[in-house]
């Protein structure tokens, strides 16, 4: 998780779009100058996460890495939790569970769980985990696999989608959905991500099929067609071409 989470953050949008927004939770306790210094640290975050993912595998470094990982999750909870942005309520228990797993798996392990490494290769579950957590996420770097299933967490590099509505379709929208639209003389735009975040307080799954389902739903809701509700899909940056 940490290895791919770090790799996914190696893009030009992470610091200005996500990291600066997250650390703004401290704007009441830090000065602008201090926030500026912390912002520069954001460029190190991808490599920091990648490193801790690797170093957790090395027993000799765990006494340093485990406290750093726990501190990272605590800071994330402070920034995104009720005391900070109060955003994405799903991620609050997720961070607590990650701390518990780190302590369970890597802290103060005095005896190896398996004396013979070949024991791992005898179970089907080992190959399932390797496939889901190591092989499939590689394809996400070329946008051929789901971002969230590849630890692309707060990476700022996600697919985007807008539904562009004619005046006819816009007028048929319920008032609660109009709140998630911007309007001007030329067109009306419904932001699916904003809609999901406001109603559920969790991010939208940023995949083509999800956006298409929302597109079809709006067409049915407004009793129009794809000419009245246009689908504008913006693919995320591919970190690797293959």
Which ranges hold each PLM region?
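Functionalized membrane-embedded alpha-helices
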Residues: 1-10, 38-79, 102-105, 151
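Membrane-interface junctions at the ends of membrane-embedded or membrane-associated helices
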Residues: 60-62, 105-120
């Amino acid at each position: 998780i940490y290895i791919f989470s770090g790799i996914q953050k190696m893009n030009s949008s992470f610091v200005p779009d996500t990291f600066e927004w997250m650390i703004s939770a401290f704007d009441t306790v830090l000065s602008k100058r201090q926030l500026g210094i912390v912002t520069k640290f954001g460029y190190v975050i991808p490599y920091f996460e990648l490193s801790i993912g690797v170093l957790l595998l090395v027993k000799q470094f765990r006494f340093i890495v485990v406290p750093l990982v726990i501190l990272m999750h605590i800071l994330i909870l402070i920034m995104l939790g009720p005391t900070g942005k109060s955003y994405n309520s799903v991620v609050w228990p997720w961070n607590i569970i990650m701390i518990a797993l780190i302590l369970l798996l890597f802290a103060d392990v005095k005896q190896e769980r398996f004396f013979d490494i070949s024991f791992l290769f005898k179970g089907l579950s080992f190959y399932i985990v390797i496939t889901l957590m190591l092989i499939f996420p590689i394809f996400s770097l070329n946008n051929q696999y789901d971002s969230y299933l590849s630890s692309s967490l707060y990476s700022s590099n996600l697919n985007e989608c807008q539904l562009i509505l004619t005046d006819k379709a816009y007028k048929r929208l319920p008032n609660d959905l109009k709140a998630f639209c911007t309007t001007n003389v030329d067109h009306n735009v419904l932001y699916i991500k904003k809609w999901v975040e406001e109603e559920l307080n969790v991010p939208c799954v940023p995949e083509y099929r999800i956006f298409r389902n929302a597109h079809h739903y709006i067409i049915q809701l407004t009793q129009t067609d794809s000419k009245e509700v246009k689908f504008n899909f913006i693919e995320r940056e591919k970190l690797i071409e293959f």
